[in-house]
């Protein structure tokens, strides 16, 4: 039974997240329905990162097993045909060994968060940014962000309904910078870790926003982290600004 690795792009706006639900539209549900229409099989997808409602992806990775040995370009093109007009695209399909698991083989996941930092709201990108109309200092945000990098208990930045067994995570990257001049109204937060807690990225971004408008100092952010107290962190940044941008796998496996 061949295993296929899919690279997927989607606009999360119309979906109630990645994970299949009985009555609500989801990315997984849309792709699995396309698989059934194309192949006649009820295959199940496993993805690298299960995104929440409204969260986007430009390089999500998933795998599925099919009984028939299809050409990979046929898999890609047939799924794209059956997914239309939904905002989901299969960028590539390839066969992989049975040992490959899109979720468990991942060694690093990358997310990007976009903040539109200007007085006027977004006209074209409103479903892909968090509009913050007051001035933010990206350098202050970046300085505060470095207090969160490393292996820590991230209970303060964890959703109440998070089902992870442990709040301990190793944050490998959390960089904040204003975009180049052509997009200078945007502040971009880039982060990477092997895994994240539910709502961790959005909670961190909301807290860094307070550092950017000088309501919190970098030391305050470190204290919030150490306290484990969710009530002390900033607002939960909206889902719209968050995009899953990639996943790394051990090249030797």
UniProtKB/Swiss-Prot annotation:
Binding of substrate, residues: 111
Molecular function (Gene Ontology), one example: tRNA pseudouridine(38-40) synthase activity
Presence of the UniProt keyword tRNA processing in the record: yes
Chain's role: Formation of pseudouridine at positions 38, 39 and 40 in the anticodon stem and loop of transfer RNAs.
Recorded family membership: Belongs to the tRNA pseudouridine synthase TruA family.
HAMAP family the record matches: TruA
Protein name in the entry: tRNA pseudouridine synthase A
Upper classification of the organism: Bacteria, Pseudomonadati, Pseudomonadota, Alphaproteobacteria, Hyphomicrobiales
Name of encoding gene: truA
